[in-house]
Amino acid sequence: MSVINCEEVKRDEFHTEKYYESYNIFGAHVVTEDEIQGVRFTVWAPHAKAMSVVGDFNEWDYEQHKMLQVTEEGIWSLFIPHIEEGEIYKYAIETLAGDVILKADPYAIYAEVRPNTASVVFDIKGYEWNDKNWTRKKKKKPIYKEAMTVYELHFGSWKKKEDGTLYSYREMVEELIPYVVEHQFTHIEIMPLVEHPYDRSWGYQGTGYYAATSRFGTPHDLMYFVDECHKYGIGVILDWVPGHFCKDAHGLYLFDGTPTYEYKDKDVQENPVWGTVNFDLGKREVRNFLISNALFWMRYFHIDGFRVDAVANMLYWNKEGQEQSNEHAVSFLRELNEAVFAEDEDFLMTAEDSTAWPLVTTPTYEGGLGFNYKWNMGWMNDVLKYMECAPEYRKHIHEKMTFSLLYAYSENFILPLSHDEVVHGKKSLLNKMPGDYWDKFAQLRLLYGYFFTHPGKKLLFMGGEFGQFDEWKDLEDLDWNLHDFEMHRYMHDYFKELIALYKRSKPLWQLDHSPEGFQWIDANNNEQSIFSFIRQGDKQEDALVVVCNFTKATYENYKVGVPDFEYYNEILNSDAEQYGGSGQVNKKRLKTILEPYHNQAAHVEITIPPFGVSILRPVKTRKGSKKQDGSKTKVRSNVTSRGKR
């Protein structure tokens, strides 16, 4: 990190212009000045009357190390000789009201382990990265036409030691990475790792945006974890919260005694539901703080993506009864995405947005917000409501399973089965399923089959892969003992086979963002709650037929219209006995019958299992058959697919 002497910085660079290396000015930097080694402290506090640095090195005496104000707009700085890395410190701020308050450093790179709240001097230089091969691989294969399976996890509750203590960043290399590799996830998405005081905020209410939480080790330890993930071909996505922050007294809130990082207007400052305050995204210094922070994580931790939290809350003012968009947030998000993609065009910027805001994943130069992915919250809500409904009544809400294809190509979507849906009394995915014990497992297998065959990249929260029975308990680890039970082992085996099938099957991801990648066979069989469709790859022969039965009935000799290939093989059946099913499978090769059905040139007759998904693959083209043309009924979109930037 190249530290810039703040006295040499033009005021406009931080206060009025785009300046995305703020971390080189602010914070605590181990430096040598006039041949004397020490630490330079720099902070922005525009309404402070006076500033000091306090810590163990001066017995927390406010009078000893007074800072110098170096710009009229409130940049303060001080070089303290002969102190070293590892010193704990805070800023003592004399407010306009004459009070002295203690604050952690907004740009601190390291902090004390909670419940202590001081910042820690840390020299971030020195880690030697070994991930050049990973970087080359990313550039060679952009994600838009590749398989993408994201494992979302909470670092502190995935697994704990026998005594209940947390695994460190370095220890998780041995615990987590082999597990992720075994399950063939392409990425992990970690809930926020910025410093935060309250465990149960899960990291979403941060105080130290530049500090990797010390709960799990040092910043260099986290770098090692990311480096090892890249070594084994795993991308690392971080949850990042640029919209709001917590009100703890040592943090950013009323930093110099006045609203500094947050809006001044109380009507838009507060988030009463979360107990947080909103960043003032119209203030240049705040934008520089946040965008510098994003680039800091990219440059120093080699992060591969951000899931940007609570975008909906940013896009709209939270004044009661007001639907007006927040133009500060809109322009900030565009500026953020432009800066990120200028740094790394292969980065993943995913919006967690539940609104119908248009063009979220359209580049800014085409009038969009500039993200390249968006969580498909509509799909998630509709599908889970459908699955929670008693099977005999699903025919009355049939449209919940078909509606998503009307807008599936309006954005680049990720399908999230996320932490939000398995907490706060919502039940686990397994326990959402109606019916008896067997029914629950059968329907979860069915849900996963539909999930992996529906257009869009995939995200699953930890525990779902083996059928966690209880909802997520953030103070405990996952119920790993469930592997002692046969049905959970079956579920785990099924999930691993399903994700392996997904990764080796181009039709399931190659045209995720193009209408040509999906075609309904029959979307209208609400009476039997059966859905059938085709997933298509770039080549004609890269096609799969998917049939999903959302009732407990078994159907034999069921006609399914198919493209004209001579034979089909069933390559996965969720009802197979090895997955805990009843064994209603199609073992034999299925010969097509050259009679049109479901607007297809031919059809096959299959057994459809109870609560089952059957995936069929064509074996060979019929001799003399013509290439499929565009006459088949396809899902159309009036929005151009944006599968690349």
Curated annotation (Swiss-Prot):
Gene3D superfamilies cross-referenced by the UniProt entry: Glycosidases (3.20.20.80), Golgi alpha-mannosidase II (2.60.40.1180), Immunoglobulins (2.60.40.10)
Protein name per the record: 1,4-alpha-glucan branching enzyme GlgB
Concerning Pfam families, the annotation shows: Alpha-amylase (PF00128), Alpha-amylase_C (PF02806), CBM_48 (PF02922)
Supply the CDD domains for this chain: AmyAc_Glg_BE, E_set_GBE_prok_N
Q: Name one GO biological process term.
A: glycogen biosynthetic process
Family membership: Belongs to the glycosyl hydrolase 13 family. GlgB subfamily.
- HAMAP family found in the cross-reference section: GlgB
The top EC class is transferase
Q: What's in the GO CC field?
A: cytosol
Gene name as annotated: glgB
- Active-site positions on this chain: D309 (nucleophile), E352 (proton donor)
Give the record's subunit note: Monomer.
Could you tell me what this protein does? Catalyzes the formation of the alpha-1,6-glucosidic linkages in glycogen by scission of a 1,4-alpha-linked oligosaccharide from growing alpha-1,4-glucan chains and the subsequent attachment of the oligosaccharide to the alpha-1,6 position.
Under Enzyme Commission nomenclature, its number is 2.4.1.18
Which UniProt key words apply to this protein? Answer: Carbohydrate metabolism, Glycogen biosynthesis, Glycogen metabolism, Glycosyltransferase, Transferase
Q: Where is the composition biased (Polar residues)?
A: 636-645
